[in-house]
């Protein structure tokens, strides 16, 4: 059976109800596993992959206990943490640094999982009106980070899974809070992710 490895933040991993700003989200990983049961083994980073530099720091540790050389597809996202404004500050990762970090994460993926095809997922939109002021994201900035990610992936010849456009069509019932998705939203994301991963396997 083929092996798929998912890298991503709490949109993938899920987010428990730990604060007034987060009402609990299952994450899409479990539904990708459900969708591809019997077709592919779906593995994932054992924690929230957060921002690109965090992924770069911990990816080697995350892949120590998996058959890394046998991974066939890596579906990867970083971006929402990078574009996050905390406590009225600038985005966590300056956009030029974000581009550099994406290239470095890609190189690390290629080194650790050399036989895998890589797919990059664009970051999803937020409900701006519900964003807490201490942890704020602007969709226009998410779009700009996605634009830069697309440029980097074009340079690296990595296909892009446009989850931003998909989720732009979601109403509030698809969201668990201002950023994370409900089961309905996670299942919708998982459907497209499973489809894109299977296309990569068959390419």
Which sequence ranges carry the predicted segments?
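Charged helix-capping and loop-helix junction motifs
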Residues: 91-103, 141-146
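Cell-envelope and extracellular/periplasmic
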Residues: 6-11, 36, 44-51, 72-93, ...
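Glycine-rich phosphate-binding loop signature in dinucleotide/nucleotide-binding domains
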Residues: 65-70, 112-113, 200
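Conserved beta-strand segments of alpha/beta enzyme cores
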Residues: 41-43, 117, 157-159
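Catalytic His-Asp segment of secreted/periplasmic serine-dependent ester chemistry enzymes
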Residues: 123-203
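Active-site segments of SGNH/GDSL-like serine hydrolases
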Residues: 77-83, 106-143
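Generic structural signal for well-ordered alpha-helices
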Residues: 59, 102-106, 146, 150
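Serine-esterase "nucleophile elbow" of acetyl-processing enzymes
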Residues: 1-48, 53, 61-69, 74, ...
